[in-house]
Regions:
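Surface-exposed, Lys/Arg-rich phosphate-binding patches that contact polyanionic backbones
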Residues: 10-30
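Short Lys/Arg-rich basic patches
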Residues: 1-11, 82-83
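Charged, low-complexity intrinsically disordered terminal regions and linker tails
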Residues: 33, 63-83
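Short, basic amphipathic alpha-helical segments that act as recognition/interaction helices
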Residues: 27-48
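Residue-level recognition of short, well-ordered coil/turn positions
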Residues: 25, 55-56, 80-81
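A general alpha-helix detector
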Residues: 16, 31, 56-60
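Short, positively charged interaction helices/loops
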Residues: 42-65
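Residue-level detection of the helix-turn-helix DNA-binding "recognition helix"
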Residues: 18, 22, 37, 74-77
């Protein structure tokens, strides 16, 4: 389910967004969405690494990401991350 957010960015992130927006002829929303998605991907990979090292359970990772166990399994599978 899509979520709409409004936020204020600090200067360095705003400068980055404006630079990318100009270079790629993209909207601010598209650039910010890409940044958020990249951050989420990194979070998923970090949680996966912790799971692989035995620092937390699969169920705990699912809870941290707000997913069911089945959804997390599917997400890891989609990203080619071993379960």
């Amino acid at each position: 389910m899509p979520v709409s957010v409004q936020t204020v960015l600090d200067d360095r992130i705003a400068q980055y967004v404006n630079r990318i927006k100009a270079q790629h002829h993209a909207t601010e929303a598209a650039v910010v969405r890409e940044l958020i998605e990249a951050g989420y991907e990194e979070t998923v990979r970090q949680r996966h690494a912790r799971y692989q090292r035995g620092e937390c359970t699969f169920r705990a990772v699912a809870a941290q990401l707000g997913l069911s166990v089945r959804e997390l399994y599917y997400l890891f599978e989609q990203k080619g991350l071993p379960v």
